[in-house]
Amino acid sequence: IIGLLCLSAVLCTPTWRRSVMAESRYGWRRRTAAAMAIALYAVLLLSPYAPHDELGATIRSIHDYSRRDRLYRIDIESNPETYPFVTARNQPLPGHAAANPPHIFIVQIESFSHKVVEATTPDGHPYTPYLNEKLKEGLCVERFYANSVQSAKGQFATLFSLIPSFKSKVFTGFAQTRFQSLPEILRDNGYSTMFFKAYRDINYDNTLGFVQKNGVDTALSIVPFLTPEDRQRIWGWGVEDEVFYKRFFEYLDAQKPIVSAEKPVFALLHTVMNHMRFNEVPREKRRLYPAAKNLQEHYANSIRLTDDHLRVFFDELAKRAYLNNAIVIVTGDHGYPLNEHGYEHNETAWYEEFFRIPFLLIAPGRLTPGRIADKAFSQMDIAPTLLDLIGIEPPRHHFLGVSIFADKPQQPIFLVQPYNGIYLGVIDDGRTKYVRHLRSGHEFLFDLTNDPQERNNLAPTADAAMKKRLHAMFRTIYLNQLLIEKDRIWKPVDGH
């Protein structure tokens, strides 16, 4: 009914507009039209068909915040004296890290959609020709997920192997909470740990304070290291990736413990060039669509430039003999919708394109290049994978992810869309995707194997047993949230 009313209003608008504009002065028609427009807008705000304009989003956010305790109530109990996620080894086995520990780099590319990898434009031009070739050198996970659509939440999942909070960013909302992190474990094993942003403000989302509190030695924005010439290559949200990579490696060159092989380095590099303002790619750098006219074409230009600059990272790495023993992961912070389901902004919905990202692990001499196609993994699995690969087994940890090398059955994939009334999701057995909208209570269920485009919602006809199993999986999301809020994720022992 609401949809029909909206359609009728849209169809009648031209007639009303002509009638209103025909009047020489403000009259009853203009007042009536204005009142009807306001009333229709109010109906939309109160309906499931929420407008996604800035005013509508603001009003919805205020409304949701005012009833947050009821809307996001966590109906789950846990012994307040326990730390359910902490796992301890049965025996205090000695660590078995390699005598020559490798350097580790995670290149986290902004808004990196999986759909462009090994794909081409309609006229046959590849979006990511360089990355396509690099896939042959490492291990590619074909179905890899970001656990959220926010950069800070993706970084939390990557470094802490936990489900991101769905109420707020852990970096800001729980800034004083202590967790265990991948950087902390590596630091305890002799690594120098770094977090570099291409964005101008390392304090954005409280990144600096939070990561340094949780195991990162050095957290910096690349902007203070830019030359005047470099600053000419800032557009959109920040500096071009090529400049970011070059200045980062120059910074490493000045770190004597790393250059002298006294310490291996772990570094997460978060790019910013491919962030939202895809239409601001300089015209002379638009390789695929010089006269781009829509989001898809602007994104294509931006991601092609991103791919060109990724070559610079590997070229700079190869120039440095002191880094010849390096592991590199290339992935994204989250995906980005390109109108596959009518959405062109990542703060709106929950389809695959919002979460699916590329994942490539390159570790010469440590693994056989290939592909993993029979299982799905997520950012939460990165920390366990790296520790497994280099042979470090912490005596205690709270990681929920699993190593991609582990001989284990498919684990659930947890998804958090914190915007637009909050959508929470879980992918069971690698194929069954269940999503619940907290604001409305609406449920969505898809068989990703038989319906990869997510067109047929099976929730209304799903059997009770399936729903019960999926609802049970949601307990992990709610328990995760409860433990974060109650500071019961991690209890350090003996200073660790």
Residue ranges and their predicted role:
Residues 87-496:
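Solvent-exposed soluble domains appended to multi-pass membrane proteins
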Residues 1-102, 119-128, 135-136, 176, ...:
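N-terminal secretory/membrane-targeting segments
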